[in-house]
UniProtKB/Swiss-Prot annotation:
One of its GO terms (biological process) is regulation of DNA-templated transcription. This is Probable transcriptional regulatory protein Neut_0281. GO terms for cellular component: cytosol. It is found in: Cytoplasm. Belongs to the TACO1 family.
Length: 241
């Protein structure tokens, strides 16, 4: 169950992200700005900022855009003061959904998030209602047909917590948030390039949705992703579409 459709779901996620590249830039600029505001403008001493910058450059964001976002976060340039908020709720068949936002207007954001849940058969819950169902961790996903033994050796020596062999043949490396960058860098030095590499909230248990239920859940997730203030959406649902 843990590995069901993992590879297909990741490919779908990547395709959806590529289709929304303009929005990704906006989200990354927000993340860089907030990371710099909270932890300073030096990526060497601010892991959150380094991750955001790595992701931005991975999406070919111009260096000038990144530097301006850092300066806004550090107060060197004027900019919007974003607030981080998390909303929790339920989708189809009780699948848990967690929505991380950055906003300059909390009232607008909660209204938009609640509307998306209500319109697509879900409901917005209270703080803490589903967050306990997820673990904060680093996640790196590798395509099937790679050297599993070598990857396992490099990952564990670099400080990875686990390597999961999914049913579809893909390999998943799990790290703590703090060791994610070190593990990723060591794997890249050994020529292992992840198809997906991120610090995320991984569900403890997944719920498989198929047919109409999967289609309905996809509409809810898409509606949440389309909200301007939404940064990330996490769910316990695995969609078999």
């Amino acid at each position: 169950m843990a590995g069901h459709s993992k590879w297909a779901n990741i490919k779908h996620k990547k395709a959806a992200q590529d289709a929304k590249r303009g929005k990704i830039f906006t989200r990354l600029i927000k993340e860089i700005t907030v990371a710099a505001r909270l932890g300073g403008g030096d990526p060497g001493s601010n892991p959150r900022l380094r991750l955001a910058m790595d992701k931005a450059f991975g999406h070919n964001m111009p260096k000038d855009n990144v530097e301006r976002a850092i300066k806004r976060g550090c107060g060197e340039l004027e900019g919007v003061n974003y607030e981080e908020i998390r909303y929790e709720g339920y989708g189809v068949s009780g699948a848990a959904v967690m929505v991380d936002c950055m906003t300059d207007n909390r009232t607008r954001t909660v209204a938009d998030v609640r509307h998306a849940f209500t319109k697509h058969g879900g409901n917005l819950g209270t703080d803490g209602s589903v967050s306990y169902l997820f673990t904060h961790c680093g996640q790196l996903l590798f395509a099937p047909d790679i050297d599993e033994a070598r990857l396992l050796e490099v990952a564990l020596n670099a400080g990875a917590e686990d390597v999961i062999d999914n049913d579809d043949g893909s390999l998943e490396v799990i790290t703590s948030p703090d060791t994610f960058v070190a593990v990723r860098d060591e794997l890249e030095k050994a020529a292992f390039k992840a198809e997906l590499a991120e610090v995320t909230w991984k569900p403890e248990n997944e719920i498989l949705l198929q047919g109409d239920d999967a289609a309905k859940m996809q509409k809810l997730l898409d509606a949440l992703e389309d909200i301007d203030d939404v940064q990330d959406v996490y769910t316990t649902a695995v969609l078999d579409i």
